[in-house]
Amino acid sequence: SFKAVSGNPRYIKKAYGAYIEDEDNNKYIDYISSFGPLILGHANLEIKNAAKDALEKGTTYGACHKGEIKIAKLISKLMPSMEMVRLTNSGTEATMSAIRLARGFTNKDKIVKFEGCYHGHADHLLVSAGSGLSTFGEPSSPGVPKDFTKHTLVAEYNNIKNVEEIFNKHKNKIAAIIMEPVPANMGLIYPKEGFLKKIRKICDENNCLLIFDEVITGFRLCLGGAESFYGIKPDLSCIGKIIGGGFPVGAFGGRKDVMEKMSPSGDIYQAGT
C-alpha cells in the first residue's frame, strides 16, 4: 500500500511490546499491530514460551492432536454461536470454507458482501473489497475472471433498503450474507442502530445464512466478539491470526446442523494440514 500513501516501505529488524525497530535503527510505536492480531503486543513472553514448547514436540503432524480440541472448546465458550469449530491456516481459508459450506447447505449460489469490506484474497471475494485493493483504484484485482465473481452481489453497508432490493431481485438465489460486523478496511464504520438486527431478519426470512467475518473484531471489540457486543447470533463466524497470537492460523464455525454438512461427517469438502 506504500504506492497509495507514498514513502518507502520500512524493513523491520525486531519488535517488542508496543515497539518496532527498522533496519536503520529507527524506533516506532506500532499502532498497526500486524493489522490486528497482536493484541498482546510483540514478542509476548507467554506466547514465546508456548511456541517454544510446541516446537519441542514437532512442527506439523498431519493428524489430530489435543491442542486443536482445547482451542476449539475455548473458542466455542467465548463465542457461543460457534457450536462446532473447524481450524484453518488463515482467515482467507476460513471465509472461503464458510462460503462453500453456506452454498452447499442452502443449495444456492449467490452471496452478498458489502462494498469496501475485505474478506481475504479468494477470487470470488475480490469485488469492491477495500483494503489493499484500493491501491489499484479498481473494483477487482486483475487475474480474476468475471465468471468467478458473477455470483457475488455487492450491497452498501448501513443501507438496509439496498440489501432488501438485492434480495427482491435475486429471490431464492442467495446462500449467505458475509459481513464484517464493524468494517475496518474502509475506515472504521460502526453499524447504525438496528442494522445488524435487520440483516439477521432478512437472512431468516430468505433461508439464507449470516456469516460474521470476525477476523478483525473477534476478541477485540469485546472478548466475545461482535456477536456478544451487539447481541446478534450469526449462523457462521470466521476468525484469523488472533487465535494464534499472530501465527498463521484461522477458524470458522457455527450452527451444529450446518457444520455437520462439512466433511468427513457431511459431503461438503474442506481440508488442510
Which residues are covered by each model-predicted region?
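Conserved N-terminal phosphate-binding loop of PLP-dependent enzymes in the Aspartate aminotransferase
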Residues: 1-273
